[in-house]
A protein has these predicted regions:
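Short, aromatic/basic amphipathic alpha-helical patches
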Residues: 197-203
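Loop-rich non-cytosolic ectodomains and luminal regions
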Residues: 224-225
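Short hydrophobic/aromatic-enriched beta-strand-loop microsegments
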Residues: 204-213
């Protein structure tokens, strides 16, 4: 319980610090699911971060069809609702984009990355609780950035004067999560996450690895992502 309480406090501090930042065009809308979906995120932490971990998986930031809707990293609706068991009410962001409405756990569109990631874990582990015994998933950045058209803009596309303070805040949070959970492994999901893992870890005693990002925008990920990710984790010695 002390561990989950500490992770919740770290997430709250991250959210508050990110809310103090400003972003300019082409970004017109910024969602912070740690605010409007806090009840679901808090439920996720209570379920997933109830003790020390062997492995922490690191994502980049929420997807508009995943965590933006559910408050859970890579939060494909059916996985969050049916496998993890999240049922908390989810409200709406203050400045909602008309093309990116937040519908929470009733959202009909499936997030492919989340379906692939949580699907792999559901195949390997008997239950979400079994997975969370040694594993936790966290995003580096909690914010979702959108352009006027509704197009998603990832943090790596932000200008440096906006990205630098954001990265500093998010790196600090990541270090805090690692200090609290004391994992043996920090596994980056994709290249951006790997860069942030390396930048943030510094003097912290944690081994860093990387797996292929499950995004459908990646041709490699569309050729049997689960098999490739499992093989990468086994090669690292994370899984056996």
């Amino acid at each position: 319980m002390i561990v989950s309480k500490s992770i919740k406090a770290a997430a709250h501090n991250l959210s508050k610090a990110c809310n103090a930042l400003n972003f300019s065009e082409p970004v017109t809308h910024v969602y912070n699911p740690l605010e409007y979906a806090w009840a679901a995120h808090e439920q996720y932490i209570s379920r997933a971060a109830n003790g020390k971990k062997k492995v922490v998986f690191l994502g980049m930031n929420p997807g508009p069809f995943g965590m933006a809707q559910t408050g859970v990293p890579f939060g494909e609706v059916s996985a969050v609702r049916d496998w993890i068991g999240i049922n908390a009410p989810i409200s709406k962001p203050e400045n909602e984009h008309p093309k990116r409405p937040i519908e929470g756990l009733t959202y009909a569109r499936s997030e492919v990355s989340g379906r692939r990631l949580w699907g792999l874990f559901a195949e390997r582990f008997d239950s979400a609780d079994a997975f969370f015994t040694d594993h936790f998933i966290v995003n580096h950045c909690p914010l979702v950035f959108m352009e006027e058209t509704g197009k998603n803009r990832t943090p790596d596309k932000l200008p440096n004067d906006e990205a630098a303070p954001l990265m500093e805040i998010c790196d600090t949070h990541l270090r805090k999560v690692i200090e609290i959970l004391e994992p043996e492994w920090l596994i980056a999901i994709g290249e951006f996450a790997e860069k942030r893992a390396l930048a943030a870890s510094g003097e912290i005693d944690v081994r860093i690895g990387k797996i292929l990002h499950p995004s459908p925008a990646s041709p490699a990920a569309n050729r049997g992502w689960a098999e490739q990710a499992s093989a990468q984790l086994k090669k690292l010695g994370v899984w056996h």
